[in-house]
Amino acid sequence: MAQFIDRRLNGKNKSAVNRQRFLKRHKEQIKESVADAVNRRSITNTETGEDVSIPHKDINEPIFHQGKGGVRERVHPGNDQFITGDKIERPKGGGQGSGSGEGNASPDGEGQDEFVFQISKDEYLDILFEDLELPNLEKNQIAKITEWKTHRAGFQTAGIPSNISVIRSLQQSLARRTAMTAGKKRLLKELEDELTRIKNIEPAQQLEENRLKKEIEELRKKIENVPFIDTFDLRFKNYEKRPVPSSQAVMFCLMDVSGSMDQATKDIAKRFYVLLYLFLTRTYENVDVVFIRHHTQAKEVDEHEFFYSQETGGTIVSSALKLMDEIVKERYPVGQWNIYAAQASDGDNWADDSPRCRDLLVNKLLPNCQYYSYIEITRRSHQTLWHEYEKLTDEFPNFAMKNIRSVEDIFPVFRELFQKETA
């Protein structure tokens, strides 16, 4: 069996390369596990990583081995009991079952525990928000958001095998062999010329001829011993993240805190907004976030008050939409900003106010918004607000609405709303 020895030097995190390779290879299984973990842990808990489990059958790695077919007899290293031709007895079972354990617990089947390992906080958030983006983000006059894109950045002497540059490595090999053998080849040529000259001299100088032959042989061995390629020659493609010009963006978070929103419904809304806030701050370096709470009256608040205030009251949803329109006109010129909004409510609204909300969206907000999402948190049948908003879905492609029934729906709905568009 062929054996491969990795002689490359690593830093203090000597397994970092292997870890990244493992995460890349089992990306889909890890994403599924992280998506399940979102519902188990508090979304605000981002100070720690996450334990990820992968079925044992999914982590089998490719190995180098002899091909199938043919007849081979082999004695494996470490064997001190058998010789070629011996047949090994079948192991005696420990019970009635065909499983891998002992005893009579199961009549059939076998299995292995899932492979469990921990990913770091950064890895957890990277996987959580992968393939998500703010829809329809356009470049405006003033760029403030910093997005990052991976670019080729020359070569480096360490890396993973998939990034190796064969041509550059062979160029380095040729340069090294030329540098290490040029002087020896020059001396070899001189000795060979000297040997030819001595052979043509009469009388023959046998001792000098033997000395030259010995030196020539030693030089040839030294030249042959220079390896064709060495780890010193290996060059790997280097990649780095560079900021790319992007645009200014503002996200309006509109949350219903009226009396009809019970504590469980408010908690779901807050979890959704925490997830949205983490996504924005993790993916984009500079995004303005405007928090608006509303019952019969709407008020712009800071982050702490948005998530922790206990204020409540009746329900007039249009008050929040009016306040958002005022803030846009005052602070966020449409020509310079990408405007986004995420509205969460239980759908309970004063009946005469729901048509007013639709008119505000049609005439004021949607023409100026890159994307507007409405999330209704309820297990009941939809009310007038949902039905009024439903009329907008065909007319405005930048408007989306989803229903969240329980905590388990938060992350799937979030991914649907902010899924990256495929080119």
UniProtKB/Swiss-Prot annotation:
One matching Pfam family: DUF444
InterPro entries: UPF0229
Compositional bias per record (Gly residues), positions renumbered to this chain: 93-102
Segment forming the signal sequence: none
Disordered: region residues: 69-112
Spans traversing the lipid bilayer: none
PANTHER family: UPF0229 PROTEIN YEAH
Record family assignment: Belongs to the UPF0229 family.
Protein name per its UniProtKB record: UPF0229 protein VP0986
Organism name: Vibrio parahaemolyticus serotype O3:K6 (strain RIMD 2210633)
